[in-house]
Amino acid sequence: MRDRSLDAFRGLTVLLMLLVNNLPPGAPAWMGHGPFGKSLYLADWVFPWFLLAMGAAIPFSRRGFLKRGLPPWLYEVRALRRALLLFLLGLGLTSLQAGRPVFALDVLQLLALAYLVGAWLYDLPPLRRLGMSLILLLGYGAALLLVPVPGVGAGVYREDANLALHLNRTYLAPLGLRGLFSAVPTGGFVLLSTFLGEALMEGRRGWLLALAALGLGSLLLWAFQAVPPGLLSPLLPLGANPLLGYTLPVALKATILKGPLQALLAALVARWGPVGGWVWTGSYMLGWWFVFYWLYRWGWVFRL
């Protein structure tokens, strides 16, 4: 099962990712990542929106699976398989960017762990599921505030001193698991986002209004429900292929496109200054949109 508004939201998220990952020189600071712990800039929305879309898709995926007459336990196995493949794909992409084999946690690996939490705990009754998601989210926040960090103390949350950083440096980084602690709130957020997926699936506007409090992403998803289908069409090619929309540009930019893209950017900036940089960014985004438009037209969707 697929939801048009959810596909459109995923497409918007992929477009946003292409934008913030390819900003030209001199781009406004608010389009990048914000100062640590102070404010949210444009780039800071990308990862949470991926998590939101992932969680909202779980109810659709599970219902479509069970409609085929397959046993529920097989869905859990399938979720484990998808998480494992996504994790391995992330390792491959991280290694490709590093130019050598690397075992480390990056974006796709964290998405895989968060998806596994959301998919496996989705079977819980609604109140227990809500309670578990809040335990993960609030428990993470409480740990940051209350657990003392050696040499720093409790309640300190600076970029150079906080509990997550201490755990990463002291215990997780030597094992290649730097960032594993972040799987706690990301898993909780994906689980919480399953309620949004259920509201979309059942058309419950009251729930959608309540869930809009989750953030701007939820509000956009709700707004997309009221948008005429034709207006959402430009976002669907990327939204139907979000995993490929993330991995393919990153992989090619790190390998065969790296040199040509840098040369083209330098030439455009030298000729037209800041305008040339934006021409490069816009052309890069438009080029990928056309790639995924034709994949969409051909019905080619990459799934794990």
Residue ranges and their predicted role:
Residues 1-304:
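Alpha-helical transmembrane segments and their immediate juxtamembrane cytosolic regions
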